[in-house]
């Protein structure tokens, strides 16, 4: 993991706590990611309810509130339970353009008790912004969140 992500995950671990509400933890996580990672125009979370992703805490411009399973990059990550790292969202079949300035995107499923409970979604106005190193670092971000999230 790169030095940047090592520092970021250490900060995240200090900012979140299993005793706190999930929305508070996700809000601080979104703010930290948006502040510490460069060349982003959106960082946040969508949470699942009955095979639909609903907008959660985020940083950036206003966003799509509801995303159906299998639709767009986030819905595909939910449906396939896999990381989606998209170099150019305009070439992604069925891309949902919440912000026309977004050009690349990475989405990572978040699990609790073996189920996908949401996704971490990060957008950039730069084509090809997200590397394998970003994916590795963001997987660790998700692991930290999965350890402290308590679902009601």
Where is each model-derived feature located?
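Short loop/turn motifs at secondary-structure junctions and domain boundaries
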Residues: 37, 98-102
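Short hydrophobic/aromatic beta-strand element in the GNAT-like acyltransferase core
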Residues: 42, 107, 119
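Regulatory loop-to-helix N-cap segments in sensory/regulatory domains
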Residues: 123-141, 148-152
């Amino acid at each position: 993991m790169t030095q940047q992500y090592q520092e970021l995950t250490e900060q995240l671990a200090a900012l979140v706590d299993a005793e706190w509400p999930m929305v508070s933890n996700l809000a601080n996580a979104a703010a930290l990611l948006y502040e510490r990672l460069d060349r982003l125009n959106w960082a946040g979370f969508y949470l699942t309810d009955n095979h639909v992703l609903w907008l959660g805490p985020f940083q950036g411009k206003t966003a799509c509130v509801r995303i159906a399973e299998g639709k767009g990059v986030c819905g595909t990550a939910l449906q396939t339970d896999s990381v989606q790292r998209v170099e150019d969202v305009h070439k992604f079949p069925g891309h949902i353009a919440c912000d026309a300035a977004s050009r690349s995107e990475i989405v990572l499923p978040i699990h609790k008790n073996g189920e996908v409970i949401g996704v971490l979604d990060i957008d950039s106005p730069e084509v090809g912004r997200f590397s394998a190193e970003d994916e590795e670092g963001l997987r660790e971000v998700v692991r930290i969140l999965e350890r402290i999230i308590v679902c009601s």
